[in-house]
């Protein structure tokens, strides 16, 4: 990835890390499926309006809309339903660690299903270091719950696997010439339609009291953490591939913890710094440029040392 893609990845991590703040406010008045439906509905309305104001049009071909619905299913509906159900069976810390397996699944799925995102030793080492860093930041004590709630754990892992397949599936939109903004609008529009019956059946929103203090949080999570975030998501996917894109899963805990320290005054613990260091090392391994630079520097030293010991008169 180049500097532009890294900048977009960091911005995406900040937007998704910030969703914890918005969700923390919104869940006081809204059940889970109603909140996520409002989130994608606000994002869909916003992106469709922006496209209209820019004079751009959504695709009308049936095959493209079928792909939008497939993307919405893999990237929103299935993982959300699985993870929400799983979190009712296991502790939230363990659920966060299991969610951090997304890049692990992605490198494996990409290796099997794509011709250009093959697994290398350096990439495997980077993903392992990133996962270890995420575990350290969240707190290794959360792993103590591994012995219980097996079905909940499997549900969270299935959600992470769904995100991995979504990353691979979403590569097709660049191939068929759909822009990042149109793809983001199509996915959240499809997700809005897919989640509507689930939300009505599970949450019975007509029984909820009128919202008082959460509209700002709903709009914030819809505009920033969904609409803008998914435009960046599909731009990174088109430019850098699924494996690099889903490294954002390692950066979200970093973003959330730093935002908590800056905005809410939460304490930064030594394990947070250790986790950030491991995640940084993992990302550097996956990026590869630092490793190539060090290898080339070592090679130059070896060659230079050989020439110093060489006497042309012998």
List the predicted regions and their residue ranges.
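C-terminal transmembrane-helix exit sites in multi-pass transporters
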Residues: 49-58, 103-128, 254-273
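Juxtamembrane helix-loop-helix junctions in multi-pass membrane proteins
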Residues: 14-45, 85, 91-93, 165-190, ...
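C-terminal-most transmembrane helix of multi-pass membrane proteins
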Residues: 38-44, 49, 214-216, 250-314
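Specific transmembrane alpha-helical segments of multi-pass solute transporters/efflux pumps
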Residues: 15-23, 48-99, 135-136, 222-240
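Helix-helix packing/entry segments at the starts of transmembrane helices
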Residues: 36-38, 76, 95-101, 169-192, ...
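Juxtamembrane helix-entry segments on the extracytoplasmic side of multipass membrane proteins
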Residues: 1-6, 29-33, 37, 60-66, ...
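Hydrophobic transmembrane alpha-helices of multi-pass small-molecule transport proteins
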Residues: 47, 69, 109, 121-141, ...
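Transmembrane alpha-helical segments that form core, pore/gating elements
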Residues: 47, 106-108, 112, 144-203, ...
């Amino acid at each position: 990835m180049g500097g532009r893609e890294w900048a977009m990845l960091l911005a995406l991590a900040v937007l998704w890390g910030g969703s914890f703040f918005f969700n923390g406010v919104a869940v006081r008045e809204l059940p889970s499926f109603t909140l996520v439906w409002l989130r994608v509905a606000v994002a869909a309305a916003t992106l469709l309006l922006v496209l209209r104001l820019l004079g751009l049009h959504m695709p009308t071909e049936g095959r493209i809309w079928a792909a939008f619905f497939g993307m919405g299913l893999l990237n929103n509906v299935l993982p959300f339903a699985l993870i929400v159900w799983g979190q009712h069976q296991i502790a939230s810390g363990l659920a966060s660690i299991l969610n951090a397996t997304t890049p692990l699944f992605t490198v494996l799925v990409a290796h099997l299903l794509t011709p250009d995102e093959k697994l290398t030793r350096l990439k495997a080492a980077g993903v392992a270091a990133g996962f270890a860093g995420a575990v350290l930041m969240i707190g290794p004590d959360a792993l103590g719950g591994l012995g219980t709630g097996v079905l909940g754990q499997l549900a969270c892992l299935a959600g992470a696997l769904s995100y991995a397949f979504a990353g691979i599936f979403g590569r097709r939109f660049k191939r068929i010439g759909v822009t990042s903004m149109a793809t983001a609008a199509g996915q959240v529009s499809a997700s809005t339609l897919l989640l509507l019956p689930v939300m009505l059946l599970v949450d019975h929103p007509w029984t909820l009291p009128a919202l008082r203090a959460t509209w700002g949080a709903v709009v914030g999570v819809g505009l920033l953490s969904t609409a803008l975030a998914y435009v960046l998501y599909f731009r990174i996917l088109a430019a850098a591939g699924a494996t690099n894109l889903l490294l954002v899963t390692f950066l979200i805990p970093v973003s959330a913890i730093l935002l908590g320290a800056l905005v809410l005054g939460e304490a930064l613990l030594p394990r947070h710094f250790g986790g950030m260091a491991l995640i940084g090392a993992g990302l550097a391994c996956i990026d590869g440029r630092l490793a190539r630079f060090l290898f080339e520097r070592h090679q130059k030293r070896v060659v230079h040392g050989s020439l110093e010991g060489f006497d042309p008169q012998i």
